[in-house]
Amino acid sequence: MGKDKKASGSGSGSKGGKDAGNKDAGKDAGKASKGAQSINVRHILCEKHGKKEEALAKIRDGADFGAVAREYSEDKARTGGSLGWKQKGTLDPEFEKVAFALETSSTSSPKIGEVKTQFGYHIIMVEGKK
């Protein structure tokens, strides 16, 4: 009889574990689909790591992101690094992964992310999400 009780207990425990796993999987899937589908993004693109580090130091010292972009970026410099509104799936995958994970912020107090892509070194900030 002891063996029967263990078998029943294990069966119930396993079944409960599977149910809990399915519920969690459903919640995670729901969260993924509810995330932002587009972002208003700016970046500073530098071919050389050293130049990216100089730009990063200026931002960390309190310089305006747009001003640093105009001085250092090798792409979109005239627009302060603005790429405008971009939808998920339209950017370089590595860039997109970092950009969509960032919190929104302003050019005067940016929350930044960094990534290296085939294009070079990027410093990224996001101004809006929808």
From Swiss-Prot:
One of its GO terms (biological process) is rRNA processing. InterPro entries: PIN4, PPIase_dom_sf, PPIase_PpiC. It comes from the Eukaryota. Residues 16-31 have a biased composition (Basic and acidic residues). Its EC number is 5.2.1.8. Residues 36-128 form the PpiC domain. SUPFAM superfamilies: FKBP-like. Transmembrane segments: none annotated. The keyword tRNA processing does not apply. Pfam families: Rotamase_3 (PF13616). Residues 1-38 are annotated as: Disordered. Gene3D superfamilies: 3.10.50.40. GO terms for cellular component: nucleus. It catalyses: [protein]-peptidylproline (omega=180) = [protein]-peptidylproline (omega=0). One of its GO terms (molecular function) is peptidyl-prolyl cis-trans isomerase activity. Keywords: Isomerase, Rotamase. Belongs to the PpiC/parvulin rotamase family. PIN4 subfamily. PPIases accelerate the folding of proteins. It catalyzes the cis-trans isomerization of proline imidic peptide bonds in oligopeptides. This is Peptidyl-prolyl cis-trans isomerase pin4.
